[in-house]
């Protein structure tokens, strides 16, 4: 028998009546960790399958006989000279047929390294039909691996087997069985790297069932399952935290608010969204890592908001946004931790986490709506005293809240629940509105407060108007008086100047007040006077000589 280098022959044996013999050709060698799994096909009486010497078995050769099995005596022998290395398993399979049924290989048959033999067997009830389709790939040094599919009476199945065996690898058969009820499809595939071990991955999809992870009731009673996008978490009543071993356990509450840096803020109000699940996972993981050395129990997210409920400052980064998550961290009932120690540990962890920006500690009494008293510091919300105006509606609920009205009040309609003097609750209008025509309407100008009874704005408007008018009148009087005073002063000065220049005569110098009527400056006469003003020039006053 001639085989390609490193190949292993897979004899096919058929048992006959009364004695069936399975023979392996001497000299056959099975390599380490190689599994030889012969495949037997049941045939009708007097059916012989023969391969002549020198015949080359090509891929996709199909032999499909039909047979009825009887009960014979099967014997399997190995011819001397067969060598099985350590770890080699030879598992011949014998199928009983009627007498005179033999299948053998003639020496000299050559099997190509890339020949494919993929037997596929289908069994039905009550009539059995066996069909074989050679399609197994035998690379050098490899061994064939059959893939078997069994279909049970009820339902239908479709399978697509695919096995890849590179040189030097060992094959691992993959078998898929469909269930009797329903319809399913499975696709199996085995990939073996050179010289490595096989790794199989099976992906199955079912047409029945739902994607809701809470349908299987994974949480122990009395905890409830809260569904996220494709996961869930278990939630207990207030004051309790969920423990996988014992369900809900009574604990100690430490409320607070944490600022988280996120890339996307859409749908954070929807617990079934992808973004909320991502945020929930980040917050829970942060606190689990922070309190891993304590008796920490669970973190419960109360609310997610873009605005902080405990700080007026908000932080915006270039590529990310900040959301504020109201949380409650649960510890053991007898924990040694207090509010200060818990807040200190969280603030230290914030410094080393890039996704967490800050932590705000919330007072436990404010969280429950109780009055601070004693050293217990509202450790038990059911026993604390409610603040004025708040009351505990249910004795089993630790929160103190404002009482509600018997009739519904809507903030959209500008309504709120008010408490009368007799303690009864009534739905009334908000401040700045009053009830008119069966609904809350805005107060007219100048009125405000409850039922528009506050007239402060109207009084302030009237007083302001009067004061403004009085100030304006004073300003006008002041301007008029100043202008009249300035005008009177200018007239007196002008009269004095005119009188002074009118009476002024400058005879020796020839100046006279010729400009007094139209100008304040005097004019000078440039003409030669007809008579000299020098007394010595007067000849009539001086005697003349006689000669």
Curated annotation (Swiss-Prot):
Which GO molecular function annotations are given, in alphabetical order?
protein homodimerization activity
Question: Which loops or segments lie on the Cytoplasmic side of the membrane, by the record?
Answer: 480-547
Protein name, entry field: Mucin-13
Quaternary structure note: Homodimer of beta subunits.
Starting at the broadest rank, the lineage of the source organism is: Eukaryota, Metazoa, Chordata, Craniata, Vertebrata
Record-annotated disulphide pairs: 214-225, 219-234, 236-248, 365-378, 370-384, 386-400, 409-427, 429-440
Among the GO biological process terms of this entry, one is:
maintenance of gastrointestinal epithelium
- Can you say where in the cell this protein is located? Cell membrane; Secreted
């Amino acid at each position: 028998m001639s085989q390609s280098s490193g190949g292993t022959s897979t004899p096919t044996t058929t048992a006959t009546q009364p004695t069936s013999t399975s023979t392996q050709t001497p000299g056959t060698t099975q390599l380490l960790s190689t599994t030889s799994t012969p495949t037997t096909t049941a045939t009708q009486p007097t059916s012989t399958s023969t391969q002549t010497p020198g015949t080359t078995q090509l891929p996709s050769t199909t032999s499909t006989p039909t047979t009825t099995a009887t009960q014979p005596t099967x014997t399997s022998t190995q011819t001397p000279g067969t060598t099985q290395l350590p770890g080699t398993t030879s598992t011949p399979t014998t199928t009983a047929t009627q007498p005179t049924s033999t299948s053998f290989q003639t020496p000299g048959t050559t099997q190509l390294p890339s020949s494919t033999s993929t037997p596929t067997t289908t069994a039905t009830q009550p009539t059995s039909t066996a069909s074989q389709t050679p399609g197994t790939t035998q690379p050098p040094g490899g061994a064939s691996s059959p893939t078997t599919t069994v279909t049970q009476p009820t339902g239908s199945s479709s399978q697509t087997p695919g096995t890849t065996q590179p040189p030097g690898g060992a094959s691992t058969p993959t078998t898929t069985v469909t269930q009797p009820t329903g319809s399913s499809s499975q696709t199996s595939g085995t990939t073996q790297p050179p010289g490595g071990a096989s790794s199989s991955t099976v992906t199955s999809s079912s047409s029945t069932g739902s994607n809701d992870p809470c349908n299987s009731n994974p949480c122990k009673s009395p905890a409830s399952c809260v569904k996220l996008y494709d996961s869930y978490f278990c939630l207990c009543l207030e004051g309790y935290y969920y423990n996988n071993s014992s369900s809900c356990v009574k604990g100690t509450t430490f409320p607070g608010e944490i600022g988280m840096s996120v890339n996307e803020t859409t749908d954070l109000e929807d617990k079934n969204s992808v973004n909320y699940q991502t945020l929930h996972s980040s917050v829970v993981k942060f606190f689990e890592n922070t309190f891993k050395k304590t008796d920490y129990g669970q973190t419960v997210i109360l609310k997610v908001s873009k605005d902080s409920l405990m700080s007026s400052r908000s932080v915006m980064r270039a590529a990310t946004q900040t959301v504020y998550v109201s949380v409650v961290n649960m510890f053991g009932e007898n924990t040694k931790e207090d509010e200060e120690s818990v807040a200190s540990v969280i603030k230290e962890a914030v410094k080393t986490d890039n996704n967490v920006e800050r932590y705000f500690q919330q007072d436990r009494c404010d969280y429950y709506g109780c009055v601070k008293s004693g050293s217990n510091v509202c450790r038990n919300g059911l026993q604390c005293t409610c603040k004025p105006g708040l009351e505990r509606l249910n004795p089993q609920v630790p929160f103190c809240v404002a009482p509600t009205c018997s009739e519904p009040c809507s903030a959209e309609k500008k309504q709120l629940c008010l408490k009368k003097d007799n303690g009864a609750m009534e739905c009334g209008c908000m401040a700045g509105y009053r009830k008119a025509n069966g609904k809350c309407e805005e107060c007219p100008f100048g009125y405000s407060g409850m039922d528009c009874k506050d007239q402060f704005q109207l009084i302030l408007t009237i007083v302001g108007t009067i004061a403004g008018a009085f100030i304006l009148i004073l300003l006008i009087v002041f301007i008029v008086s100043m202008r009249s005073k300035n005008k009177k002063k200018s007239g007196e000065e002008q009269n004095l100047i005119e009188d002074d220049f009118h009476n002024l005569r400058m005879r020796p110098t020839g100046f006279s007040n010729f400009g007094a009527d139209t100008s304040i400056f005097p004019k000078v006469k440039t003409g030669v006077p007809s008579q000299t003003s020098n007394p010595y020039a007067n000849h009539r006053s001086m005697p003349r000589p006689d000669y």
